[in-house]
Amino acid sequence: MGQVYETLAPWTEALLRAAVGLALVPHGLRNTFGFFRDTGVRAHNIAELAAQLDRDGYRPGRLWAPLISLLQLAGGPMLALGLFTRPVAAAILVFLIVTNVERWRVGGYFWNQLGLEYTLMWTIAVVYFLVHGGGVYSLDHLWLGREY
């Protein structure tokens, strides 16, 4: 079985990287362009996101809202493709740490109470790519010849 695991490991790593990165995109589409309106959030464009961030104490919201949108809409696909994996993972990690603190403040641990359970799982996955890089099947490896 060792050979099977060795063969599958780079593919499963790439699949996890793609899932983690692409999971950010719908959030960016919702917060930036108003897609997926019936998903329980109050922000459906940059201005509403900025106002929400201000209300939640993350000031200035007009600074953070476009950065969050950029991270979700550009950083997510970059992580998915393994492009500048470690720097992008570091930026996403900062965002997710703040998200986890907010989720803990609002709902504790359990996701059905709006807690951090779900976002914590994504945070741990991002830490993996911060530490390990994009892997063999990444644009970093293809273009740079190494994991970045």
Locations of the language-model features?
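Extended, low-polarity transmembrane helix blocks
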Residues: 1-44, 48-55, 59-70, 74, ...
